[in-house]
């Protein structure tokens, strides 16, 4: 995960994504989980594969304009590919659930492994060019509509979830949609605030299961941390 977060060029990011996906796939082998979770493996890792291919396509597209570019200076014409690559992994563009959910991974190291693709994708969102889709207003409007739908749907599902565990993916999608909207509005660096809330406040909520009566005030502190977001 650190390799993906601190990757300076797209080649290193592709390698890191493949490595993380491979480790997660090995940990999610059908013999180690329920039949329901095993049935979702092709869908989840199919989405991950598409996101990696989109990242590779964006790398090639960027090289045609600026050979050897870094992730801190993504060419504008390659931005749409990087947006799709990150959006697929976050479940925002298009709306999907690229996360494995089972009782075996409620807490501990399994949760950290689940959040690895999320953290690396948020790092990509924060580095998207400021003029993303500036010359393609139709695509920009379409992506904004899709992102808004994803945010509203995920927020509703999170509020009406039967349990904290079942609502977890929708927390990720809802806040990731806010981060994506920042990039679509030309303020990609502002997405770091939403990404931080997703990971820090979200991790506190995720790990606080089942709740412990004596420290029930701790999740409230995590929620209060969102108040200062722009």
Model-predicted segments: where are they?
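Transmembrane alpha-helix interface/packing and boundary motifs in multi-pass membrane proteins
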Residues: 154, 158, 222-229
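Short helix-boundary/re-entrant hairpin motifs in multi-pass inner-membrane proteins
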Residues: 81-143, 166-170
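Hydrophobic residues within the alpha-helical transmembrane core of Major Facilitator Superfamily
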Residues: 50, 83, 125, 152, ...
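Short juxtamembrane and helix-loop transition motifs at transmembrane-helix boundaries
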Residues: 5, 72-78, 100-108, 124-136, ...
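Alpha-helical transmembrane segments of multi-pass membrane proteins
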Residues: 22, 119, 145-152, 198-203
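Alpha-helical multi-pass transmembrane bundles of energy-transducing inner-membrane proteins
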Residues: 1-77, 87-92, 157-219
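Physicochemical signature of membrane-embedded alpha-helices that form the seven-helix bundle of GPCRs
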Residues: 47, 81, 143-146, 218
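Transmembrane helix-loop boundary segments of multi-pass membrane transporters
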Residues: 134-139, 190-197, 230
């Amino acid at each position: 995960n650190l390799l993906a977060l601190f990757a300076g060029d797209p080649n290193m990011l592709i390698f890191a994504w493949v490595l993380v996906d491979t480790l997660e796939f090995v940990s999610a082998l059908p013999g180690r989980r329920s039949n329901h979770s095993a049935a979702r493996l092709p869908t989840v890792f199919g989405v991950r594969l598409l996101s990696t291919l989109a990242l590779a396509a964006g790398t090639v597209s960027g090289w045609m304009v600026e050979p050897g570019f870094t992730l801190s200076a993504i060419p504008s014409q390659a931005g749409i590919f990087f947006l799709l690559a990150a959006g697929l992994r976050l479940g925002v563009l298009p709306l999907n659930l690229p996360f494995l959910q089972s009782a075996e991974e409620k807490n501990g190291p399994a949760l950290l492994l689940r959040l690895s693709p999320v953290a690396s994708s948020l790092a990509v969102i924060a580095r998207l060019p400021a003029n993303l889709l500036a010359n393609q207003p139709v695509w920009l409007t379409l992506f904004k509509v899709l992102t808004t739908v994803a945010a509203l749907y995920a927020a509703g599902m999170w509020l009406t979830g039967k349990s904290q565990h079942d609502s977890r993916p929708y927390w990720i999608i809802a806040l990731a949609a806010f981060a994506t909207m920042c990039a679509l509005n030309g303020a990609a660096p502002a997405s770091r605030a939403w990404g931080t809330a997703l990971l820090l406040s979200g991790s506190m909520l995720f790990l606080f299961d089942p709740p412990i009566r004596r420290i029930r005030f701790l999740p409230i502190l995590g929620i209060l941390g969102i108040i200062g977001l722009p």
